[in-house]
Each structure stands twice: as C-alpha cells, then as structure tokens.
C-alpha cells in the first residue's frame, strides 16, 4: 500500500475486516460534473454535446419572424475569463462570473423571390447574453460576495404513473385507479375512474371530461375505440334463436341460462348449472364450433359495430347500442345475419369504455376538439383555427410540450416497449397505450406504481436547474426578437440591436440569488460544507411543499439503500424531505441515483464493479458486504443474507448475482464519521450526524483517537486543506505561503517550475467561524502530487478533527450533570482546548445625502481621547486594536439640517466660531455584547473620489505581497535556469568572454562561480549548438521577467481602479474583529452519538474526580444519559479511546527511555498487525518509524469503520496491550480494564463503585451562550402598541406573558403585576413619570393607562361600537 506524505506521519490503525475494493469517489463530483456539463467551457464550439447551455440555445433558436422572411440563427457561444478571482469577489461583494457571448447569424430572405426562398443577406455578430456565475473548485458559487450552494432537487421523474386512491375517496372503500402522464415541461394529462366505473380525463387538473372525447379528438371513431378495448362475440341470427361462436375461456365460471348441447344435440351443460373445466373439455372433445342460444340471450348485449342495411344504406343500429327486441326485429327485416357484440364480464373484462362512450355527447372529431377547447378556454368563441391550434399545442407541439429523454425512456419502459428512444411529444398510440394499461389495472391485471421508489424520482442538479432558468430567460428574449425581426431589413438592424440580454441576466440572477434551492452555504466546518453540497431536497420549485408532504414521501424506502442516507435528515418539519447522498452514490445520464455493486459469477465475487439504478437493482439478488468470502473470492456460507426486489432473505450462494462494495455504502458522509454507528439507536445517530455539522473549529484541532477511517477523505475533498498540484521539494515555508520547486518530470516545458501556495489566514466564514490554514511541511520535504501541505479549519495532519479528545467519566456529580448537563474541568478552559475564534464583519458606508456628503474622519467633537487614540488620521481603527462594546471603529459625521438658534447661541457662535453642531456623529461602533481584536480593515472608494491615506496604504501592502510572490517565482526560475546553464557550460570550449577569457579555453566550474550569473551570457562558445542553447535560456528568462512585469501591472490596475459601490455610496469601510470565545457555562456540547448537553459548571481541577495516579477527569457525564437513549456507541468509543491513549502513553515512555528502534518496531507491529487491516511497517525507514512514534504519543488513532468495526475481543486485546497488569494496578483499573476506581477531588475519599472512564471525541457546537445572552434596560418600542420589541436583534425586552401574569396573580403580588403591565411595558406617560420621580429622589410609581388598552378601544370602535372612558 502506498502511504502519502502525511499518512506516514500518523497511521490510523483500522479494525476493518474487509479489503477496500472500491475507493470512495470524489465527494463533490456530483456538483462539479453537473456544472461543467452545463457550461462545456473547455470543449470547442463544434464538438459541444446538446446539453446545458448548448441545448438551451438550440431549443430556442432559430427564431423566425412572423412573416417568415427573416430568421436569427445560433452559431456558437463563448465564455470570457472572469474579471476578478474568487477572493477579490468575496472582498468586494461581487459575483464570481463570466460574460457569455453568443455568435448569432441574421439571415434575410428575398421577399420578391417567386418560387423557393432565396437568401438575400447574412449578418453574423457576437452578442452579449448576460453573465453566468461560475462554480468555485469546491462546488460553491460566490454571489454578491457570499458563498452559496445550489442544492440538488429530487423530483418526480417525467413519464407515466399509475396509482389508486387506496380507497379513501369513496365511502365504499372502492379502489379508484388513475394514470398521469407527466412531461418535463408542458400540460399534465390525467386519466381517472369515478366510483361508477366511468373513465375520465383532465388536462392540467382542470374540469374532467369522458375519456372518449379525447379518443375522438385524436381521430378515432366509436367503432375503432371499441375495437381497441374489447374482444367481440360473434353471433349468427337463425330463424329460431341464434348461434354463438364457441370460445371456451369466455364461458368458464358462467351460469348456463339454457341447456348447452353439442352438434348432435346431446346436453352437455344443464340449465342453471355453473360451467366448469370438465364441461369445457367435453365441448372441446365434441369439436364444438358454435353453440345454439335462445334469442333473449342476445338482449341487453352491446353492438360492437354500426349495423347498416346493405340495400338502402340506412344505419339500423350504431356501435355501442344495446340490442333490444326492436333492434332484433329491424335486423331480421333487413336480413342481416352476422352481428358482433362486446364481450364483457364482471371479473376481468369490465364495460368501462363502453359506458364512458354512452355518456359522451360529442359526435365527431371536431366536436370533441371544441369540447376540449371550451374546457381549456371557457368563454372564448371556438373558431376552427383556434380549436386546432390549441389542441395541437397541448401535446403535439415541440415548443410547448417536452417529455425529455428521461420521460420518453420511462414512458416506453412502463408501457412495455423495447426501444427507449422516441419523439419528445405525445403520440396517439402513447395515449391509447396509457388508457389500455389503466383499464387492465381496473380489470385486476398488473400493479400500480410506487411513487416513492427511487426509480420514479430523479435528481435535478445545478447544471440542469441553471439550464432551465437560462432557457426561461431565452424564451422571454425570443418573444421580443420575434416582434423586432419584421423591421430587421427596413431599419437595417444588426443582431445586437435585436437581442436584449436583460431577461436572461435577470432570470439567472434571480435563480442564483433568491431561488429556494440556492442556499447560503453552511460553512461552520469542512463537514458542513461537504454535506450541504451533497444535499438532496424534495422541496423547491416543481417539488413538494412541507405542508402537503405526507408520511410516505418522508419515510425510508428500500430503494434508498446505497443511494440516499437513511439516517441523516433534519429533525422538525423538513424530516425526510431533505436527504443526503450516500457515500458511493452517483447520478446516471438520466439523473437517477445509482450505487456500485461487485459482480458475482457462479458464487465467486469478481473485481468487476457495476453501478445499478433502483430499477435495475430490483432484478438481481444482492448479497451484503459482510458476507464471508474465501481467499479465491468464493462465498463460503451455506446461506447468505441478501436482498431481492426490496425484500431481505437468506439464499444459497449460487443464486447471488451481486454484492455490496462496502458496509458503509448505505450511509452518508456525516453518518459514516460516527464510530460504532451500528450500536446506536437510529434517532440518536440522526442527531449525531446533524450535530457534527455544527461543531465549531477549535483553536488547535485535535484528531479523534477513535475515528472511522474516512476522516482523511472528508478533509481533503472539502477543499479546506491545501493539496500539492505537482510533486517536488519544499523550497520555502512561512505561516502565509509555501513555495515548492516542482520535479523535472512533472514540469511542463516553458512553464515556471514552481508552485506557490498562498494560505488563507484568519478569514471569516459564512457562519463567522475562523478559516485559517497552517503549513504541515518543512523546507526540504519531498512531496508528491495530492499530498496535504497545509491543514485548514478543523483538520489535523490532513484528517478531519471537529472536536477534542476528552477524558470522560460516567458518574453523577452533585446534581451538576442532571438532565444531560455537562461538568467540565477548569483545566480544559485553561488549556484553551475549546477556545474558538469567531470573526465578525462590521460595515459602515458614507453616502451622499441631500444636505451634503457624509464624511469618514477623525475629527469628531466630544469624543474621548481614549476613543480617538485608536483611530488613525483617516478616522479608521488600527489593525491590532483591542476594542470593547461601544468603542468607535470608524469615525463618521453626517450633515444635519440647520436648527433655529436663539440670539444667545448666535452670539456665542460669532465669538467662538463654533460650527461643529451642524453635523451629527454617526460613527461605526462595536455592537453591545461584543469585544475583540481588529484583524483587518478594507476601504472601498467610489471611482473619481480621492482615496484617503489608509486606503492607499492597504493597496500598497497588497501590491508588496504580490511582488514578493513574483520575486519568489523569478528566483526559482532563474535558479533553475542557472543550474542547467552551469551543467551545460562546464567543460565547453570558449571563444572568449568576461574577465579576459582566452580563446580555446575550457570553461571550469571555478571560473563560473567567480563570475556574476548574468555575465555567463557574455561567454562566447565555440560550439554553435551550445551557443544557441545559451541564447534560448537567456531569452526565456527575459520573457519570464516581461510576463511577471505585465502580471504586476495588471494587478496594480485592478487595485487602483475605483470600486463598484451601490448607488449613492461614496465610501465603504469593512472592519473585521476577531472574537475569542472560551468555553463557559451555557455553551452546548455534544459527542458524535447524539449525546448532547449544556455545560452547567466549570469546576476547579482540584475538585474533579481523579484516578489512583492523580490524573483528574476532564468531563463528567451522567450515566443515565445512556440506557434510555440506547446510544451505546459512546461507551464503546470511550473504551477504545482509553486503549488508544494508553498505547500512546506506552510509546511515549519508550521514546523517553530511548528504547531501541527494533523494540519500537515490534511494539508498533503488535498494535497495527495483530488484527484488522495490516499496515506495511517494514517499508518504513528507522527515521520514519521514530517520527511516526513521536506523533503517536498522544494516542494511537483507531479507525472502526461503520458496520465493520472493532469487535469486543479486539477492544479487550487493545486494552490489555495498552495497560499491562502493573500499569493497570497503579491506575486502579478493574480486571476487565474498562472501569477505574475514582477518588473524590474534594474529600479525597474513594467513590463506592468503579466508574467507566476513557476518551471520547467531544465537540463544542455553534450554539454559544455569548450569542444568546442579552439584557435591556430601555430601548426601542413598537409603534402601535408602544410595547418593547422582542428578540436580541432588535435589542428587545423579555415578554411577560399570560402564564407569568398568572404566577404573579397566584402570589398576590399586585404592585409588581401593576408595574409589569404598565410602566415597564406600554404606559407611555408612566414611563417618563417614573424617570422624573427617580431623578427627584421620590420613589413612587404613578401607573397610568396602558397604550394597548387604547388600541383595544380603537379596535372595538372600528367594529362600530362606541366605547368611552369615564375619567374621574
């Protein structure tokens, strides 16, 4: 196995029993691939596939004018590179996007041409079509400076669906069957039975009409309709009675209404006897072709065809007429012998279409179409053209109706056709096929569809959603272009005059900015980012709504297996509607979710991996991943647990066709990070996977000692870590940047052989957490492509590290851990284990007001010297200043209107020249409850306005940093070039050169070292080829310098041009504060098993329970939190964590006493290779073994993969290895080594019972008490009721509600109650009166009339009831 640079430093011991057969795919692939197919930016315009933008353009173009003499054709499109990079867009509040230009061709035809159209003129031009936001490499979008994610949508696939109402509609409980044809866009077509078994159809959920109207409208006559849906009985009229053609299966089960005889007149079935199989056999044996029936047997039957008198041509009876005695007489009169009737019965051949035809009053095709027109457009007069146009537009027009590739495939599969391609509009036979299946269902044949089956729901990804929006914009443009195309020739217009890109831009902007599926990215930690991008929502436009979604849609379905996680979903109203993709899930070309399986042939598991969709999976028998497999791949168990068509069963190995690729296949990323997930109750696992996404990154991330082995994948795929693009040697490292000299074999010719990585330092995330990258390589390290070079937020040596490993004791402690409260040692706070940095962004804008411009300045009257001391000459706070609530960050004054002055004031003004009072201080201050350190300031100035010193200084610093980067690149490029030169020149013969180099001298190394490098180019070589090489190297260095100068100029131009600010804004200043949040009582914490709680007390270290060797616990949890919640995984994690730490301590002790490398190797082999997945420690050098051991001192990290984790024996073995008997005795451990004797920190006495102690990875969640704590004395009041506003954001008060009033009433505290309901709430005069009284030192409350009472009086008056108060 190949170890990466960082993996070698700290190997995670895995307890997995099964080899890795299939690597976890790149976790953001769905988003990135979808958007790249939408753009097809890297494909040449001629080779683009008809999808994404290309498909949208080709579906709308060509646009033809109303008169048909001008048309606008689409040629190709191109995307220009974005003007600003991602970081610049975030700083400036811009959208990271690219301008879209389309090359279109205006073709004008000759109106005079008599026969066929002749092209008169062609104009081709590139037209700007708006901006398309671009996806960042991590799968998000930067819209107006904030990162957003477009969530994929799970919607009902286009196609045809059959269902019944489960007997809920009608009181009898009868099943009413219905069918629905859903196109990708266009009108929905529904068919449904009513309780009387008449079949109706409706378009777009409008009024229902008999289905035969639709069949007539598509051109079928009543005869053809009946022929399509029924089989016929043939009768020949005889002078007495009639003869019926004998069809055996139609008679079985019927009761004979007369004696049935064979040809010779022998009675085979007597009257009133039920016809059974023996009777049929006898009739068959007698070779019966016809059966004689009495005449009344015909009465009540329904004619299948029109009966016409052969001589006169008169229609005697119509198709679908019942045969009556009158009809029979007419038939005999006209000497008609042969008639056909419909064969129906009550069991499997109902007369539904016949009875529908009977209530249908339309006569022919036109009448049927008029009826449909009247239903769609009530009140409009049906002219023939309008009727035809509407009907054709409903299902037959490609503009208005699109089944899509998926819809056609699903439709054809459902109606049993073999080919999966076909026209994208509805065809007549599609409608017929649907009705036939629906009638079959009513007849009891076939099954209805399961709507929640993942074969009937598909995923719409970013690319597809964006394409739909873009198409909608283009369609709006098309309407406008059509209008103007008529004037194109007369007014000599060019394509850009015809096309206005506004509708496209606004459609795209609206989608990315405010669609329900475009969400503000959850960026608390790397896991929350990845999960957000892998989310699949059933809500959104064209999806479900929370209120309408029933229980079935939200429930776990068997087809979710390996596609959608059954665990991770939000609690609350969205449960089950928002899901997460499973680890290995992937979308196929139709948008259906697929999951990988290993192929099994003749009960042998092969390495072939097939991706199966939910429908395909139903056809196979699939074994679980934990089935026992021998070395040669054969399945060894007699019976193997497997799944077939959604059912779990035990089958013999020879029946198995596929096998799961991994046990973690069924869960999502977040759930697969929970160790011992298999021992947790599902509800708690749900909470655990949701709470990991809320973990705040700690100051010093610490890897989980007990993990699942997927931590590295998550950290790397999330993009928070820095990965090497190319391998090479680390040339330079500091906290902000790394320079890597690329390997020769990876460097492209003519390219700079150097990669510079600028790290993200103390940047604010969307959730105000801190994103900061730290290098984990040192100069001289050799790295390969894909190695982790720097850790980001919540990552430790390239692994996800959401919390800290805490020494946990499960025991009650003086009621401080009652009801999930958490007791924490002061040492945890002192060591800054859970300290996190939060970055707040505060903005101030200087606008142009009616009274003059606002000004950002230091010159503010009556501001204390302490406050002014923090501001520079421009009035902006210094970086590094420590600020508290209320401190000024940016000084700003706003002009205010002239006030009328008294003569005295005028005099004073005249004497002192006091002019300061006509501006008011509107400075940016630190909000209440916040304090921190200023870490960054950004100043944006409108174009054409003088920059202040601070703004100029910020630009200069930025340019300085950029120059440093370029110099580094140049230094390495030149170094590299001169090394090659030295190798080339040494030993060559010279014709002369600097320092009087004689002709014919061989050049030596010493001579070159003595010369300045740039003078090497002055050496004249005898060998012409070498001389040419020397020139080439000189040119390439010059060229590189020129390139770098150009790049620098470009950067300077970008920085010095004015900033785009909203209208009316002259200047904007952003100040970033770093706030340090230490752990404190009231903060919410949780483990990974849904074991959440609130910190109740931080206890001095000396009072915490401690072990025999004096080691105190970090956290004390209540043991009662485990049994009822059934999340036993946390206890197993604690045991294994205890073993992991113990092993680390033993390795630390070996290093301390400088044990031999061989002893270290032996111990490490015992840890890694006794059970679980073996590691190749023999391939490590001695130095690597020592470095590995040093990194393991804090605990050997274990991986216990989901559903394939450590067993009880393995845990016991690890505990025995970590704590040999002598160590265990010193620690006071029980013989089983999973409990310890603890002592009370306050009394020193031993606790009565042993306690479970060990290490658990514990997280601090984003619900911090600092953000929630809030107090108010006076503040804003509501306008109408005059009561204080509510909530922290409004600086509101605490509501003293109904129940609180009852409490005071119960105590009889009438004065308290009075002040609560009056002066402390909405008695306006009383409020001021109280203040006056307090100032006078007179502590009396004069309660008046509450304002809300006045509101009540006004409301009663508005009802017309006059109500007055008698004030005495």
UniProtKB/Swiss-Prot annotation:
Tell me yes or no: is Lipoprotein among this UniProt entry's keywords: no
Query: What InterPro entries does the entry give?
Result: DNA-dir_RNA_pol_bsu_ext_1_sf, DNA-dir_RNA_pol_bsu_external_1, DNA-dir_RNA_pol_su2, DNA-dir_RNAP_su2_dom, DNA-dir_RNAP_su2_hyb_sf, RNA_pol_bsu_bac, RNA_pol_bsu_CS, RNA_pol_bsu_protrusion
Q: Does the keyword ATP-binding apply?
A: no
Q: A single Gene Ontology molecular function, please?
A: DNA binding
Which GO annotations describe the biological process of this protein?
DNA-templated transcription
Recite the UniProt keywords alphabetically.
DNA-directed RNA polymerase, Nucleotidyltransferase, Transcription, Transferase
UniProt superkingdom: Bacteria
Which PANTHER family did the record assign? DNA-DIRECTED RNA POLYMERASE I SUBUNIT 2 (PTHR20856)
Q: Which family does it belong to?
A: Belongs to the RNA polymerase beta chain family.
Q: What does this protein do?
A: DNA-dependent RNA polymerase catalyzes the transcription of DNA into RNA using the four ribonucleoside triphosphates as substrates.
Partners and quaternary state?
The RNAP catalytic core consists of 2 alpha, 1 beta, 1 beta' and 1 omega subunit. When a sigma factor is associated with the core the holoenzyme is formed, which can initiate transcription.
Name of the protein described by the UniProt record: DNA-directed RNA polymerase subunit beta
Name the encoding gene, please. Answer: rpoB
């Amino acid at each position: 196995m190949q170890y990466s640079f960082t993996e070698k430093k700290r190997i995670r011991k895995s307890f997995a029993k099964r080899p890795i057969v299939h690597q976890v795919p790149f976790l953001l692939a769905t988003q990135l691939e979808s958007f790249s197919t939408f753009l097809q930016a890297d494909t040449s315009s001629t080779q683009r596939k008809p999808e994404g933008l290309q498909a949208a353009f080709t579906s709308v173009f060509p646009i033809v004018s109303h008169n048909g003499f001008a048309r606008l054709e689409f040629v190709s499109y191109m995307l220009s590179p974005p003007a600003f990079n991602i970081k610049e867009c975030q700083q400036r509040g811009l959208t990271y996007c690219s301008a879209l230009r389309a090359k279109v061709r205006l073709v004008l035809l000759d109106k005079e041409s008599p026969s066929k159209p002749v092209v008169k003129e062609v104009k081709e031009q590139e037209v700007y079509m708006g901006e398309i936001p671009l996806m960042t490499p991590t799968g998000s979008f930067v819209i107006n400076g904030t990162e957003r994610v477009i969530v994929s949508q799970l919607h009902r696939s286009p196609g045809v669906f059959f269902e019944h109402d489960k007997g809920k509609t009608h009181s009898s409980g009868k099943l009413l069957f219905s069918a629905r044809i859903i196109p990708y866009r266009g009108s929905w077509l529904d068919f449904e039975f009513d309780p009387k078994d008449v079949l109706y159809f409706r378009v777009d959920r409008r009024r229902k009409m008999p289905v035969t109207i639709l069949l007539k409208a598509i051109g079928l006559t009543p005869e053809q309709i009946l022929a399509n849906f029924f089989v016929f009985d043939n009768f020949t009229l005889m002078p007495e009675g009639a003869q019926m053609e004998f069809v055996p299966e139609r008679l079985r089960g019927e009761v004979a209404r007369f004696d049935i005889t064979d040809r010779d007149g022998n009675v085979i079935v007597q009257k009133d006897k039920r016809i059974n199989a023996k009777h049929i056999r006898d009739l068959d044996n007698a070779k019966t072709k016809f059966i004689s029936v009495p005449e009344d047997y015909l009465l009540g039957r329904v004619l299948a065809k029109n009966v016409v008198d052969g001589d006169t041509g008169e229609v005697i009876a119509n198709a679908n007429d019942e045969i009556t005695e009158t009809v029979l007489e007419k038939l005999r009169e006209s000497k008609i012998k042969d008639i056909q009737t419909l064969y129906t019965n009550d069991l499997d051949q109902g007369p539904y279409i016949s009875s529908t035809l009977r209530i249908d009053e339309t006569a022919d095709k036109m009448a049927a179409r008029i009826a449909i027109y009247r239903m769609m457009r009530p009140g409009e007069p049906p002219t023939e053209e309008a009727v035809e146009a509407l009907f054709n537009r409903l299902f037959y027009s490609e503009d208005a109706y699109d089944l899509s590739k998926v819809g056609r495939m699903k439709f054809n599969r459902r109606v049993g056709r073999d080919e999966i391609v076909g026209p994208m509009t509805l065809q007549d036979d599609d409608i017929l096929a649907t009705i036939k299946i629906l009638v079959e269902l009513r007849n009891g044949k076939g099954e209805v569809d399961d709507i929640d089956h993942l074969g009937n729901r598909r995923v719409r990804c970013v690319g597809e959603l964006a394409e739909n929006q873009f198409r909608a914009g283009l369609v709006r443009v098309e309407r406008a272009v059509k209008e103007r195309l008529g004037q194109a020739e007369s007014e000599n217009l060019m394509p850009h005059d015809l096309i206005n890109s506004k509708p496209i831009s606004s459609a795209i902007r609206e989608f990315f900015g405010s669609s329900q599926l475009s969400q503000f990215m959850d960026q608390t930690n790397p896991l929350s980012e990845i999960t957000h991008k892998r989310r699949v929502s059933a809500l959104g436009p064209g999806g479900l709504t929370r209120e309408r979604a029933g229980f079935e849609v939200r429930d776990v379905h068997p087809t979710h297996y390996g596609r959608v996680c059954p665990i991770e979903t939000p609690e609350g109203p969205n449960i089950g509607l928002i899901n997460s993709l499973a680890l290995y899930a992937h979308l196929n070309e139709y948008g259906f979710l697929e999951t990988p399986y290993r192929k099994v042939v003749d009960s042998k598991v092969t390495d072939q991996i097939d991706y199966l969709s939910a429908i395909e999976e139903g056809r196979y028998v699939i074994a679980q991943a934990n089935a026992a497999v021998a070395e040669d791949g054969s399945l060894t168990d007699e019976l193997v647990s497997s799944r077939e068509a959604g059912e779990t069963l035990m089958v013999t190995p020879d029946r198995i066709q596929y096998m799961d690729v991994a046990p973690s296949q069924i869960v999502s990323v977040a759930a697969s990070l929970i160790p011992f997930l298999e021992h947790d109750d599902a509800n708690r696992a749900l909470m655990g996977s949701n709470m990991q996404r809320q973990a705040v990154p700690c100051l010093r991330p610490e890897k989980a000692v007990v993990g699942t082995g997927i931590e590295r994948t998550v950290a790397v795929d999330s993009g928070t870590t820095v990965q090497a693009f190319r391998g090479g040697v680390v040339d330079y490292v500091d906290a902000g940047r790394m320079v890597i000299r690329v390997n020769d074999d990876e460097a492209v010719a003519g390219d700079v052989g150097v990669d510079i990585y600028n790290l993200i330092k103390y940047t604010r995330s969307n959730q105000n957490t801190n994103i900061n990258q730290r290098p984990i390589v040192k100069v001289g390290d050799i790295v390969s492509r894909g190695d982790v070079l720097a850790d980001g937020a919540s990552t430790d040596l390239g692994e996800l590290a959401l919390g800290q490993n805490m020494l946990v004791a499960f025991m009650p402690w003086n009621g401080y851990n009652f009801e999930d409260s958490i007791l924490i040692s002061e040492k945890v706070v002192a060591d800054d284990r859970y300290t996190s940095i939060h970055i707040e962004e505060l903005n101030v804008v200087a606008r142009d007001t009616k009274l003059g411009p606002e000004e950002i300045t230091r010159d503010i009257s009556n501001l204390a010297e302490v406050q002014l001391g923090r501001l520079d000459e421009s009035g902006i706070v210094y970086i590094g200043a420590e600020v508290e609530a209320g401190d000024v960050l940016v000084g700003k004054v706003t002009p205010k209107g002239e006030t009328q002055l008294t003569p005295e004031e005028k005099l004073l003004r005249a004497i002192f020249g006091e002019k300061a009072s006509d501006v008011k201080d509107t400075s940016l201050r630190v909000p209440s409850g916040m304090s921190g350190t200023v870490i960054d300031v950004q100043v944006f100035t409108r174009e054409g306005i003088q920059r202040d010193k601070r703004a100029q200084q910020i630009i200069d610093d930025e340019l300085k940093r950029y120059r440093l980067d370029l110099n580094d690149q140049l230094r390495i490029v030149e170094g590299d070039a001169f090394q090659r030169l030295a190798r080339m020149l040494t030993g060559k013969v010279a014709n002369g050169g600097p320092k009087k180099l004689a002709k014919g001298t061989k050049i030596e190394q010493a001579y070159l070292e003595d010369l300045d490098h740039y003078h090497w180019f002055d050496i004249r070589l005898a060998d012409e080829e070498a001389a040419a090489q020397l020139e080439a190297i000189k040119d390439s260095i010059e060229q590189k310098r020129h390139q770098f100068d150009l790049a620098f100029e470009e950067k300077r131009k970008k920085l010095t041009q004015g900033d785009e600010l909203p209208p009316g804004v002259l200047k904007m200043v952003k100040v970033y504060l770093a706030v340090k949040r230490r752990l404190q009582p009231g903060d919410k914490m949780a483990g990974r098993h849904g074991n959440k709680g609130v910190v109740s007390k931080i206890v001095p270290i000396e009072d915490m329970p401690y072990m025999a060797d004096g080691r105190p616990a970090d956290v004390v949890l209540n043991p009662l939190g485990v049994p009822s919640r059934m999340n036993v995984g946390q206890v197993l994690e604690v045991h294994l964590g205890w073993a992991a730490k113990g092993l680390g301590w033993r390795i630390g002790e070996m290093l301390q006493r400088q044990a031999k490398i061989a002893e270290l190797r032996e111990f490490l082999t015992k840890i890694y290779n006794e059970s679980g997945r073996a590691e190749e420690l023999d391939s490590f050098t001695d130095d690597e073994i020592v470095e590995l051991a040093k990194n393991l001192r804090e605990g050997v990290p274990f991986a216990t993969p989901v559903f394939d984790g450590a067993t009880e024996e393995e845990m016991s073995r690890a505990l025995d290895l970590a704590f040999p008997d002598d160590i265990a005795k010193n620690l006071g451990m029980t013989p089983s080594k999973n409990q310890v004797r603890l002592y009370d920190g306050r009394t020193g006495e031993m606790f009565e019972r042993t306690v479970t102690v060990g290490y658990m990875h514990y997280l601090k969640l984003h619900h911090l008490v600092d953000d929630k704590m809030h107090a108010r004395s006076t503040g804003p009041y509501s306008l109408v009721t005059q009561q204080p506003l509510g909530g922290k954001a409004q600086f509101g008060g605490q509501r003293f509600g109904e129940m609180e009033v009852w409490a005071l009433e119960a105590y009889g505290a009438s004065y308290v109650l009075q002040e609560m309901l009056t002066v402390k709430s909405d008695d306006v005069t009383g409020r001021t009166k109280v203040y006056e009284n307090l100032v006078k030192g007179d502590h009396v409350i004069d309660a008046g009339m509450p304002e809300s009472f006045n509101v009540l009086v006004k409301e009663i008056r508005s009802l017309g009831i006059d109500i007055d108060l008698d004030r005495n």
